Amino acid sequence: MDIIKYDVYRGPNIGIFTSVNDKFVFVPNGFAKTKAENLAHYLQTEYLMTPVANTRLLGILMVLNNHGILLPRTSSPEEITNLRKCTDLNVKILDTKYNALGNLISVNDKGGIVSPIIEKEYVKEIEDVL
């Protein structure tokens, strides 16, 4: 695996603004198209520009793997529709009181870990979507 150094909005905090699986790199609306293309080329993915909860904070707010995407309840219907239309992934809202799902849930295609502050009733839903 090759690793490159890459900045987002001229800052070091790449995980705040982007999210990646094997097929897509998700970047915020307004992200420079050439930077998105270069990033997608390097990662050998497609890029998709989208807001999450009408913000640029994709990495903080969304959690995904190659099966699905979980979004906070503050996400708009248009965002959900667009992600469903542009990907072949299962896209769902996790209706918990917490919105920083990317900070509270970490998954790959084989398993995951969930913060203890996530209510137990949501664990099965997380398993089903992802």
List the model feature ranges, each with a label.
Residues 1-130:
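The feature marks the mature, well-folded catalytic cores of soluble enzymes
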